[in-house]
Protein backbone atom coordinates (compact mmCIF):
# COMPACT_ATOMS: atom_id res chain seq x y z
CA UNK A 1 0.00 0.00 0.00
CA UNK A 2 2.90 2.34 0.74
CA UNK A 3 4.25 1.69 -2.79
CA UNK A 4 0.82 2.48 -4.25
CA UNK A 5 0.60 5.77 -2.38
CA UNK A 6 4.09 6.88 -3.44
CA UNK A 7 3.66 6.23 -7.18
CA UNK A 8 1.42 8.85 -8.81
CA UNK A 9 0.35 6.62 -11.73
CA UNK A 10 -0.35 3.51 -9.64
CA UNK A 11 -2.15 5.57 -7.01
CA UNK A 12 -4.33 7.19 -9.70
CA UNK A 13 -5.29 3.78 -11.10
CA UNK A 14 -5.94 2.49 -7.57
CA UNK A 15 -8.17 5.44 -6.69
CA UNK A 16 -10.11 5.20 -9.97
CA UNK A 17 -10.45 1.42 -10.22
CA UNK A 18 -10.51 0.24 -6.61
CA UNK A 19 -11.45 2.91 -4.07
CA UNK A 20 -13.66 5.08 -6.28
CA UNK A 21 -17.06 5.39 -4.52
CA UNK A 22 -20.15 4.48 -6.53
CA UNK A 23 -23.84 4.73 -5.54
CA UNK A 24 -24.94 1.38 -4.13
CA UNK A 25 -28.21 1.30 -6.08
CA UNK A 26 -27.02 1.71 -9.69
CA UNK A 27 -28.32 -0.94 -12.11
CA UNK A 28 -26.83 -2.75 -15.10
CA UNK A 29 -27.84 0.21 -17.28
CA UNK A 30 -24.82 2.03 -15.82
CA UNK A 31 -22.56 -0.63 -17.37
CA UNK A 32 -23.04 0.69 -20.90
CA UNK A 33 -20.46 3.40 -20.41
CA UNK A 34 -17.97 0.62 -19.67
CA UNK A 35 -19.21 -1.28 -22.75
CA UNK A 36 -18.62 1.83 -24.85
CA UNK A 37 -14.99 1.90 -23.71
CA UNK A 38 -14.62 -1.82 -24.53
CA UNK A 39 -16.08 -1.24 -28.01
CA UNK A 40 -13.69 1.66 -28.58
CA UNK A 41 -10.72 -0.56 -27.69
CA UNK A 42 -12.02 -3.34 -29.98
CA UNK A 43 -12.42 -0.88 -32.86
CA UNK A 44 -8.98 0.64 -32.32
CA UNK A 45 -7.14 -2.70 -32.23
CA UNK A 46 -9.07 -4.31 -35.10
CA UNK A 47 -8.87 -1.10 -37.16
CA UNK A 48 -5.09 -0.82 -36.81
CA UNK A 49 -4.69 -4.46 -37.86
CA UNK A 50 -7.05 -3.99 -40.81
CA UNK A 51 -5.13 -0.90 -41.96
CA UNK A 52 -2.04 -3.08 -42.38
CA UNK A 53 -3.78 -4.96 -45.20
CA UNK A 54 -5.90 -2.17 -46.70
CA UNK A 55 -5.01 -0.31 -49.91
CA UNK A 56 -6.50 3.19 -50.14
CA UNK A 57 -6.85 3.19 -53.92
CA UNK A 58 -10.07 2.99 -55.95
CA UNK A 59 -8.66 0.12 -58.05
CA UNK A 60 -7.36 -1.84 -55.07
CA UNK A 61 -9.56 -1.05 -52.03
CA UNK A 62 -12.38 -3.51 -52.76
CA UNK A 63 -10.01 -6.31 -53.78
CA UNK A 64 -7.69 -5.70 -50.82
CA UNK A 65 -10.58 -6.39 -48.45
CA UNK A 66 -11.59 -9.51 -50.42
CA UNK A 67 -7.98 -10.70 -50.27
CA UNK A 68 -7.92 -10.05 -46.53
CA UNK A 69 -11.02 -12.22 -46.06
CA UNK A 70 -9.92 -15.03 -48.39
CA UNK A 71 -6.13 -15.25 -48.05
CA UNK A 72 -4.96 -13.65 -44.79
CA UNK A 73 -5.08 -15.91 -41.72
CA UNK A 74 -8.13 -14.92 -39.67
CA UNK A 75 -8.62 -11.91 -41.92
CA UNK A 76 -12.33 -12.71 -42.11
CA UNK A 77 -12.46 -12.53 -38.32
CA UNK A 78 -10.76 -9.13 -38.28
CA UNK A 79 -13.18 -7.74 -40.84
CA UNK A 80 -16.32 -8.99 -39.12
CA UNK A 81 -15.13 -7.95 -35.66
CA UNK A 82 -14.56 -4.42 -36.95
CA UNK A 83 -17.81 -4.26 -38.95
CA UNK A 84 -20.02 -5.65 -36.18
CA UNK A 85 -18.00 -3.78 -33.57
CA UNK A 86 -19.15 -0.51 -35.16
CA UNK A 87 -22.79 -1.59 -34.91
CA UNK A 88 -22.43 -2.73 -31.31
CA UNK A 89 -20.58 0.49 -30.48
CA UNK A 90 -23.58 2.51 -31.59
CA UNK A 91 -26.01 0.16 -29.81
CA UNK A 92 -24.28 0.63 -26.45
CA UNK A 93 -23.82 4.39 -27.01
CA UNK A 94 -27.53 4.79 -27.83
CA UNK A 95 -28.53 2.84 -24.70
CA UNK A 96 -26.03 4.89 -22.66
CA UNK A 97 -27.58 8.15 -23.92
CA UNK A 98 -31.15 6.94 -23.48
CA UNK A 99 -30.37 5.93 -19.91
CA UNK A 100 -29.15 9.48 -19.32
CA UNK A 101 -32.40 10.86 -20.73
CA UNK A 102 -34.58 8.51 -18.69
CA UNK A 103 -32.89 9.08 -15.34
CA UNK A 104 -32.10 12.76 -15.90
CA UNK A 105 -28.33 12.24 -15.78
CA UNK A 106 -27.86 15.09 -18.26
CA UNK A 107 -29.09 17.75 -15.84
CA UNK A 108 -26.88 20.09 -13.83
CA UNK A 109 -24.30 19.68 -12.33
CA UNK A 110 -23.53 17.08 -15.03
CA UNK A 111 -24.08 19.47 -17.94
CA UNK A 112 -20.49 19.35 -19.22
CA UNK A 113 -20.43 15.57 -18.88
CA UNK A 114 -23.48 15.38 -21.15
CA UNK A 115 -22.15 17.96 -23.63
CA UNK A 116 -18.83 16.11 -23.96
CA UNK A 117 -20.81 12.92 -24.57
CA UNK A 118 -22.78 14.57 -27.39
CA UNK A 119 -19.50 15.77 -28.97
CA UNK A 120 -18.17 12.19 -28.81
CA UNK A 121 -21.41 10.94 -30.38
CA UNK A 122 -21.12 13.46 -33.23
CA UNK A 123 -17.53 12.41 -33.88
CA UNK A 124 -18.61 8.76 -33.79
CA UNK A 125 -21.15 9.43 -36.54
CA UNK A 126 -18.49 11.13 -38.68
CA UNK A 127 -16.05 8.26 -38.08
CA UNK A 128 -18.72 5.67 -38.89
CA UNK A 129 -19.57 7.41 -42.16
CA UNK A 130 -15.90 7.67 -43.17
CA UNK A 131 -15.42 3.98 -42.45
CA UNK A 132 -18.54 3.07 -44.43
CA UNK A 133 -16.91 4.50 -47.57
CA UNK A 134 -13.62 2.58 -47.27
CA UNK A 135 -14.77 -0.87 -48.57
CA UNK A 136 -15.49 0.92 -51.88
CA UNK A 137 -18.63 -1.06 -52.57
CA UNK A 138 -21.68 0.25 -54.40
CA UNK A 139 -23.33 1.63 -51.28
CA UNK A 140 -20.01 3.09 -50.07
CA UNK A 141 -19.46 5.05 -53.28
CA UNK A 142 -22.97 6.43 -53.58
CA UNK A 143 -23.26 7.24 -49.88
CA UNK A 144 -20.04 9.26 -50.18
CA UNK A 145 -21.41 11.06 -53.25
CA UNK A 146 -24.75 11.93 -51.63
CA UNK A 147 -23.45 12.96 -48.20
CA UNK A 148 -20.50 15.04 -49.40
CA UNK A 149 -22.83 16.88 -51.80
CA UNK A 150 -24.72 18.15 -48.76
CA UNK A 151 -21.81 20.48 -47.95
CA UNK A 152 -22.79 22.58 -50.99
CA UNK A 153 -25.57 24.14 -48.89
CA UNK A 154 -22.92 26.29 -47.18
CA UNK A 155 -23.02 29.73 -48.79
CA UNK A 156 -19.97 30.95 -50.76
CA UNK A 157 -17.53 28.25 -49.57
CA UNK A 158 -19.73 25.15 -49.98
CA UNK A 159 -18.67 24.25 -53.53
CA UNK A 160 -14.98 24.79 -52.74
CA UNK A 161 -15.14 22.54 -49.68
CA UNK A 162 -16.78 19.74 -51.69
CA UNK A 163 -14.09 19.97 -54.39
CA UNK A 164 -11.45 19.88 -51.65
CA UNK A 165 -13.10 16.81 -50.06
CA UNK A 166 -13.30 15.05 -53.41
CA UNK A 167 -9.85 16.12 -54.53
CA UNK A 168 -11.39 16.80 -57.92
CA UNK A 169 -14.82 17.13 -59.49
CA UNK A 170 -16.24 13.79 -58.36
CA UNK A 171 -15.69 11.08 -55.74
CA UNK A 172 -12.46 9.35 -56.76
CA UNK A 173 -9.06 8.20 -55.54
CA UNK A 174 -8.13 11.43 -53.65
CA UNK A 175 -11.49 11.21 -51.83
CA UNK A 176 -10.77 7.66 -50.69
CA UNK A 177 -7.30 8.67 -49.48
CA UNK A 178 -8.71 11.60 -47.50
CA UNK A 179 -11.43 9.46 -45.95
CA UNK A 180 -8.98 6.73 -44.98
CA UNK A 181 -6.63 9.24 -43.31
CA UNK A 182 -9.48 10.90 -41.41
CA UNK A 183 -11.02 7.56 -40.43
CA UNK A 184 -7.67 6.49 -38.99
CA UNK A 185 -7.26 9.79 -37.12
CA UNK A 186 -10.75 10.23 -35.63
CA UNK A 187 -10.65 7.30 -33.14
CA UNK A 188 -7.59 8.80 -31.45
CA UNK A 189 -9.42 12.13 -31.10
CA UNK A 190 -12.32 10.17 -29.61
CA UNK A 191 -9.92 8.59 -27.09
CA UNK A 192 -8.89 12.08 -25.96
CA UNK A 193 -12.52 13.17 -25.65
CA UNK A 194 -13.34 10.00 -23.69
CA UNK A 195 -10.57 10.94 -21.26
CA UNK A 196 -12.18 14.38 -20.88
CA UNK A 197 -15.58 12.70 -20.46
CA UNK A 198 -14.21 10.57 -17.60
CA UNK A 199 -12.68 13.64 -15.94
CA UNK A 200 -16.11 15.35 -15.96
CA UNK A 201 -17.62 12.14 -14.55
CA UNK A 202 -15.11 12.03 -11.71
CA UNK A 203 -15.76 15.70 -10.91
CA UNK A 204 -19.36 15.18 -9.76
CA UNK A 205 -19.54 11.38 -9.47
CA UNK A 206 -21.99 8.92 -10.97
CA UNK A 207 -25.72 9.46 -10.86
CA UNK A 208 -28.18 6.78 -9.73
CA UNK A 209 -31.71 5.58 -10.62
CA UNK A 210 -33.27 7.84 -7.99
CA UNK A 211 -31.52 10.93 -9.34
CA UNK A 212 -30.61 11.93 -5.78
CA UNK A 213 -27.06 12.98 -4.90
CA UNK A 214 -25.80 11.06 -1.88
CA UNK A 215 -22.35 10.83 -0.29
CA UNK A 216 -23.56 8.33 2.32
CA UNK A 217 -24.97 5.35 0.41
CA UNK A 218 -21.82 4.62 -1.58
CA UNK A 219 -19.57 1.58 -1.85
CA UNK A 220 -16.07 1.03 -3.35
CA UNK A 221 -15.85 0.21 -7.03
CA UNK A 222 -13.86 -2.96 -6.32
CA UNK A 223 -14.93 -5.70 -5.74
CA UNK A 224 -18.65 -4.91 -6.04
CA UNK A 225 -18.84 -3.19 -9.41
CA UNK A 226 -15.76 -4.92 -10.82
CA UNK A 227 -17.54 -8.29 -10.53
CA UNK A 228 -20.71 -6.75 -11.91
CA UNK A 229 -18.85 -5.29 -14.90
CA UNK A 230 -17.04 -8.57 -15.60
CA UNK A 231 -20.29 -10.55 -15.52
CA UNK A 232 -22.06 -8.17 -17.89
CA UNK A 233 -18.92 -8.05 -20.07
CA UNK A 234 -19.08 -11.83 -20.56
CA UNK A 235 -22.73 -11.58 -21.64
CA UNK A 236 -21.81 -8.75 -24.01
CA UNK A 237 -19.03 -10.85 -25.58
CA UNK A 238 -21.42 -13.79 -26.10
CA UNK A 239 -23.90 -11.54 -27.94
CA UNK A 240 -21.15 -9.81 -29.91
CA UNK A 241 -19.45 -13.00 -31.11
CA UNK A 242 -22.82 -14.58 -31.89
CA UNK A 243 -23.16 -11.93 -34.60
CA UNK A 244 -19.49 -12.17 -35.65
CA UNK A 245 -19.58 -15.95 -36.14
CA UNK A 246 -23.19 -16.72 -37.06
CA UNK A 247 -24.63 -13.54 -38.62
CA UNK A 248 -21.64 -11.39 -39.69
CA UNK A 249 -23.50 -9.58 -42.47
CA UNK A 250 -26.87 -9.23 -40.75
CA UNK A 251 -26.25 -5.59 -39.78
CA UNK A 252 -24.59 -4.68 -43.10
CA UNK A 253 -25.87 -4.06 -46.62
CA UNK A 254 -25.59 -6.63 -49.47
CA UNK A 255 -24.93 -3.94 -52.12
CA UNK A 256 -21.57 -3.27 -50.50
CA UNK A 257 -20.39 -6.67 -51.75
CA UNK A 258 -20.53 -5.22 -55.27
CA UNK A 259 -17.55 -3.16 -56.38
CA UNK A 260 -18.25 0.58 -56.73
CA UNK A 261 -19.52 1.56 -60.17
CA UNK A 262 -20.19 5.22 -60.93
CA UNK A 263 -22.36 4.23 -63.92
CA UNK A 264 -24.84 2.13 -61.91
CA UNK A 265 -26.97 3.76 -59.22
CA UNK A 266 -28.40 1.47 -56.49
CA UNK A 267 -32.18 1.24 -56.39
CA UNK A 268 -32.20 2.57 -52.84
CA UNK A 269 -29.26 4.45 -51.28
CA UNK A 270 -29.14 3.99 -47.50
CA UNK A 271 -26.49 4.55 -44.81
CA UNK A 272 -25.71 2.09 -42.04
CA UNK A 273 -28.68 1.20 -39.81
CA UNK A 274 -27.49 3.37 -36.90
CA UNK A 275 -27.79 6.53 -39.01
CA UNK A 276 -31.24 5.77 -40.44
CA UNK A 277 -33.25 8.09 -38.11
CA UNK A 278 -31.10 11.08 -39.13
CA UNK A 279 -31.22 10.04 -42.78
CA UNK A 280 -35.03 9.98 -42.57
CA UNK A 281 -34.99 13.57 -41.30
CA UNK A 282 -32.62 14.67 -44.05
CA UNK A 283 -34.62 13.39 -47.00
CA UNK A 284 -38.12 14.05 -45.63
CA UNK A 285 -37.65 17.83 -45.93
CA UNK A 286 -38.01 18.95 -49.59
CA UNK A 287 -35.68 21.93 -49.20
CA UNK A 288 -32.03 20.80 -49.27
CA UNK A 289 -30.76 23.53 -46.93
CA UNK A 290 -33.48 22.89 -44.34
CA UNK A 291 -32.89 19.15 -44.61
CA UNK A 292 -29.19 19.50 -43.84
CA UNK A 293 -29.98 21.97 -41.05
CA UNK A 294 -32.44 19.49 -39.51
CA UNK A 295 -29.85 16.71 -39.77
CA UNK A 296 -27.19 18.72 -37.94
CA UNK A 297 -29.55 20.23 -35.36
CA UNK A 298 -31.04 16.81 -34.54
CA UNK A 299 -27.67 15.94 -32.97
CA UNK A 300 -26.47 19.36 -31.78
CA UNK A 301 -29.74 20.18 -30.02
CA UNK A 302 -29.11 17.29 -27.61
CA UNK A 303 -26.19 19.26 -26.15
CA UNK A 304 -28.59 22.03 -25.06
CA UNK A 305 -30.87 19.76 -23.01
CA UNK A 306 -29.09 20.44 -19.66
CA UNK A 307 -29.56 24.19 -20.16
CA UNK A 308 -33.22 23.91 -21.21
CA UNK A 309 -34.35 21.67 -18.37
CA UNK A 310 -35.03 23.11 -14.91
CA UNK A 311 -36.53 20.05 -13.19
CA UNK A 312 -35.74 19.70 -9.50
CA UNK A 313 -36.58 15.99 -9.64
CA UNK A 314 -34.40 14.28 -12.21
CA UNK A 315 -35.33 10.64 -12.49
CA UNK A 316 -38.36 9.27 -14.35
CA UNK A 317 -38.67 6.90 -11.40
CA UNK A 318 -40.65 9.69 -9.68
CA UNK A 319 -42.05 11.36 -12.82
CA UNK A 320 -44.77 9.24 -14.41
CA UNK A 321 -45.63 11.72 -17.17
CA UNK A 322 -41.96 12.08 -18.09
CA UNK A 323 -41.66 8.29 -18.14
CA UNK A 324 -44.50 7.93 -20.69
CA UNK A 325 -43.04 10.82 -22.66
CA UNK A 326 -39.67 9.07 -22.80
CA UNK A 327 -41.11 5.79 -24.11
CA UNK A 328 -43.14 7.58 -26.76
CA UNK A 329 -39.96 9.46 -27.80
CA UNK A 330 -38.10 6.15 -28.07
CA UNK A 331 -40.92 4.76 -30.24
CA UNK A 332 -40.63 7.86 -32.44
CA UNK A 333 -36.88 7.25 -32.89
CA UNK A 334 -37.52 3.65 -33.95
CA UNK A 335 -40.20 4.86 -36.35
CA UNK A 336 -37.75 7.36 -37.88
CA UNK A 337 -35.25 4.54 -38.29
CA UNK A 338 -37.88 2.47 -40.10
CA UNK A 339 -38.74 5.40 -42.38
CA UNK A 340 -35.06 5.90 -43.20
CA UNK A 341 -34.81 2.30 -44.40
CA UNK A 342 -37.75 2.67 -46.81
CA UNK A 343 -37.71 4.08 -50.37
CA UNK A 344 -37.91 7.86 -50.77
CA UNK A 345 -41.57 7.90 -51.77
CA UNK A 346 -45.02 8.49 -50.33
CA UNK A 347 -46.19 7.87 -47.65
CA UNK A 348 -42.74 7.54 -46.07
CA UNK A 349 -41.62 11.10 -46.88
CA UNK A 350 -44.66 12.81 -45.38
CA UNK A 351 -44.50 10.56 -42.30
CA UNK A 352 -40.81 11.44 -42.00
CA UNK A 353 -41.59 15.15 -42.14
CA UNK A 354 -44.16 14.95 -39.34
CA UNK A 355 -41.89 12.67 -37.30
CA UNK A 356 -39.00 15.14 -37.68
CA UNK A 357 -41.21 17.97 -36.40
CA UNK A 358 -42.30 15.74 -33.51
CA UNK A 359 -38.65 14.95 -32.68
CA UNK A 360 -37.78 18.62 -32.25
CA UNK A 361 -40.97 19.28 -30.27
CA UNK A 362 -39.97 16.50 -27.87
CA UNK A 363 -36.43 17.83 -27.40
CA UNK A 364 -37.09 21.59 -27.36
CA UNK A 365 -40.56 21.81 -25.82
CA UNK A 366 -41.86 18.68 -24.10
CA UNK A 367 -38.77 17.46 -22.24
CA UNK A 368 -37.88 20.93 -20.83
CA UNK A 369 -41.47 21.97 -20.03
CA UNK A 370 -43.10 18.76 -18.81
CA UNK A 371 -41.78 19.38 -15.29
CA UNK A 372 -43.94 22.51 -15.05
CA UNK A 373 -47.04 20.43 -15.81
CA UNK A 374 -45.97 17.75 -13.32
CA UNK A 375 -45.42 20.38 -10.63
CA UNK A 376 -48.88 21.88 -11.23
CA UNK A 377 -50.50 18.45 -10.94
CA UNK A 378 -48.64 17.72 -7.68
CA UNK A 379 -49.72 21.09 -6.21
CA UNK A 380 -53.33 20.44 -7.21
CA UNK A 381 -53.28 16.99 -5.60
CA UNK A 382 -51.71 18.39 -2.43
CA UNK A 383 -54.33 21.15 -2.18
CA UNK A 384 -57.13 18.63 -2.66
CA UNK A 385 -55.63 16.36 0.01
CA UNK A 386 -55.30 19.25 2.48
CA UNK A 387 -58.92 20.32 1.91
CA UNK A 388 -60.18 16.77 2.51
CA UNK A 389 -58.10 16.53 5.68
Curated annotation (Swiss-Prot):
<dbReference type="InterPro" id="IPR048260">
    <property type="entry name" value="Cytochrome_b_C_euk/bac"/>
</dbReference>
<dbReference type="InterPro" id="IPR036150">
    <property type="entry name" value="Cyt_b/b6_C_sf"/>
</dbReference>
<dbReference type="InterPro" id="IPR005798">
    <property type="entry name" value="Cyt_b/b6_C"/>
</dbReference>
<keyword id="KW-0999">Mitochondrion inner membrane</keyword>
<feature type="binding site" description="axial binding residue">
    <location>
        <position position="183"/>
    </location>
    <ligand>
        <name>heme b b562</name>
    </ligand>
</feature>
<dbReference type="GO" id="GO:0016020">
    <property type="term" value="C:membrane"/>
</dbReference>
<keyword id="KW-1133">Transmembrane helix</keyword>
<feature type="transmembrane region" description="Helical">
    <location>
        <begin position="179"/>
        <end position="199"/>
    </location>
</feature>
<dbReference type="GO" id="GO:0006122">
    <property type="term" value="P:mitochondrial electron transport, ubiquinol to cytochrome c"/>
</dbReference>
<dbReference type="InterPro" id="IPR027387">
    <property type="entry name" value="Cytb/b6-like_sf"/>
</dbReference>
<dbReference type="InterPro" id="IPR030689">
    <property type="entry name" value="Cytochrome_b"/>
</dbReference>
<protein>
    <recommendedName>
        <fullName>Cytochrome b</fullName>
    </recommendedName>
</protein>
<feature type="transmembrane region" description="Helical">
    <location>
        <begin position="113"/>
        <end position="133"/>
    </location>
</feature>
<comment type="subunit">
    <text>The main subunits of complex b-c1 are: cytochrome b, cytochrome c1 and the Rieske protein.</text>
</comment>
<feature type="binding site" description="axial binding residue">
    <location>
        <position position="82"/>
    </location>
    <ligand>
        <name>heme b b562</name>
    </ligand>
</feature>
<keyword id="KW-0496">Mitochondrion</keyword>
<dbReference type="GO" id="GO:0008121">
    <property type="term" value="F:ubiquinol-cytochrome-c reductase activity"/>
</dbReference>
<keyword id="KW-0249">Electron transport</keyword>
<keyword id="KW-0812">Transmembrane</keyword>
<keyword id="KW-0479">Metal-binding</keyword>
<dbReference type="GO" id="GO:0005743">
    <property type="term" value="C:mitochondrial inner membrane"/>
</dbReference>
<feature type="transmembrane region" description="Helical">
    <location>
        <begin position="76"/>
        <end position="98"/>
    </location>
</feature>
<keyword id="KW-0408">Iron</keyword>
<comment type="similarity">
    <text>Belongs to the cytochrome b family.</text>
</comment>
<feature type="transmembrane region" description="Helical">
    <location>
        <begin position="32"/>
        <end position="52"/>
    </location>
</feature>
<dbReference type="Pfam" id="PF00033">
    <property type="entry name" value="Cytochrome_B"/>
</dbReference>
<dbReference type="GO" id="GO:0045275">
    <property type="term" value="C:respiratory chain complex III"/>
</dbReference>
<dbReference type="GO" id="GO:0046872">
    <property type="term" value="F:metal ion binding"/>
</dbReference>
<keyword id="KW-0679">Respiratory chain</keyword>
<feature type="transmembrane region" description="Helical">
    <location>
        <begin position="325"/>
        <end position="345"/>
    </location>
</feature>
<feature type="binding site" description="axial binding residue">
    <location>
        <position position="197"/>
    </location>
    <ligand>
        <name>heme b b566</name>
    </ligand>
</feature>
<keyword id="KW-0813">Transport</keyword>
<dbReference type="InterPro" id="IPR005797">
    <property type="entry name" value="Cyt_b/b6_N"/>
</dbReference>
<feature type="transmembrane region" description="Helical">
    <location>
        <begin position="225"/>
        <end position="245"/>
    </location>
</feature>
<dbReference type="InterPro" id="IPR016174">
    <property type="entry name" value="Di-haem_cyt_TM"/>
</dbReference>
<feature type="binding site" description="axial binding residue">
    <location>
        <position position="96"/>
    </location>
    <ligand>
        <name>heme b b566</name>
    </ligand>
</feature>
<keyword id="KW-0472">Membrane</keyword>
<keyword id="KW-0349">Heme</keyword>
<feature type="transmembrane region" description="Helical">
    <location>
        <begin position="353"/>
        <end position="373"/>
    </location>
</feature>
<feature type="transmembrane region" description="Helical">
    <location>
        <begin position="290"/>
        <end position="310"/>
    </location>
</feature>
<dbReference type="InterPro" id="IPR048259">
    <property type="entry name" value="Cytochrome_b_N_euk/bac"/>
</dbReference>
<comment type="function">
    <text>Component of the ubiquinol-cytochrome c reductase complex (complex III or cytochrome b-c1 complex) that is part of the mitochondrial respiratory chain. The b-c1 complex mediates electron transfer from ubiquinol to cytochrome c. Contributes to the generation of a proton gradient across the mitochondrial membrane that is then used for ATP synthesis.</text>
</comment>
Amino acid sequence: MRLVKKNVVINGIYEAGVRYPEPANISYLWNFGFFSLICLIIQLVSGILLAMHYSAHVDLAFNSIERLVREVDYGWLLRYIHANGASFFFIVVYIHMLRGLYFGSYQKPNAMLWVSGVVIFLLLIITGFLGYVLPWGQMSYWAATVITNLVTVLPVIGEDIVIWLWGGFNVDNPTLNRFFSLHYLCPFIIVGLVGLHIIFLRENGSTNPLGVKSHVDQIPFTPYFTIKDLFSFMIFLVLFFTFVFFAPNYLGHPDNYLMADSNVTPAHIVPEWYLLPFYAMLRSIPNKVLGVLALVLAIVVLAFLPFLTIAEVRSSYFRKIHKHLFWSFLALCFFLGFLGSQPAAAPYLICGLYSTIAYFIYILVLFPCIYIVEKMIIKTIMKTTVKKA
